[in-house]
């Protein structure tokens, strides 16, 4: 599988065995990472294509391409890479756990229409519903997804969540576009003010963010773990 590295915003579940990543450590997958452009704060299309070609020459061509992750300020270049990756027989998934509400509100990107085969998502982050998840895709993948979910991964479902999710989806239909837009505006405003008072906010070149997230380089004050602990104590 090829995915974003954790330093580039990928989720730990997409990581290598040696990084305690779920995909590598638990599922035994051979993991490679997309090339990342730190200036643009997103995936580097040309370098990613070159890497895939190099992996092909080593007979290590990934079977899965995983867009999305835990931290990404800007949409991933799905349209720019989808045809290329499919031309190398990869299944393309988009991990929309953190940005599902922004996608539903039409304010981020539209992965399935941009070329992904499937999209996984949370129902409890930017979509503001009860905790849970969904797998979205096309009819051609329906049976394989069903078999993977049961008996492959689950044995039951949480029926008590369904009413809450229905209400959350109804609210998203009514208020989702405005909510997503304001969420992004809030993140931009926070980033700009943090920058104004002297913090090193990443992504300034592109307006800091087009998602709900703001990323700050805290190395002037200490390492990330220490700063996180200090903020927890101060909260």
Where are these regions (language model features)?
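Conserved PLP-enzyme active-site core in the AAT-like
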Residues: 2-200, 229
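Conserved C-terminal alpha-helix-loop-beta "cap" of PLP-dependent enzymes
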Residues: 188-235
């Amino acid at each position: 599988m090829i995915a974003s590295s954790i330093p580039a915003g990928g989720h730990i579940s997409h990581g290598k065995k040696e990084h305690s990543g779920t995909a590598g450590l638990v599922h035994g997958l051979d993991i490679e990472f997309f090339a990342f452009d730190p200036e643009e704060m997103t995936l580097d299309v040309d370098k990613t294509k070159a890497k895939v070609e190099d992996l092909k020459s080593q007979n290590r061509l990934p079977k899965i391409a995983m867009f999305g992750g835990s931290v990404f300020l800007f949409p991933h270049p799905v349209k720019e890479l989808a045809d290329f990756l499919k031309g190398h027989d990869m299944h393309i998934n988009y991990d929309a756990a953190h940005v599902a509400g922004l996608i539903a509100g039409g304010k981020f990107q539209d992965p399935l229409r941009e070329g992904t085969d499937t999209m996984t998502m949370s129902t409890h982050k930017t979509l503001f519903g009860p905790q849970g998840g969904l797998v979205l895709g096309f009819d051609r993948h329906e049976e394989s997804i069903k078999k993977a979910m049961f008996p492959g991964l689950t044995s039951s479902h949480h029926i008590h969540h369904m009413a809450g999710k229905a209400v959350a989806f109804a609210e998203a239909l009514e208020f989702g576009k405005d909510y997503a837009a304001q969420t992004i505006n809030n993140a931009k405003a926070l980033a700009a003010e943090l920058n104004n008072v002297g913090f090193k906010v990443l992504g300034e070149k592109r307006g800091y963010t087009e998602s709900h997230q703001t990323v700050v380089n805290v190395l002037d004050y200490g390492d990330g773990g220490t700063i996180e602990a200090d903020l927890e104590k101060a909260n």
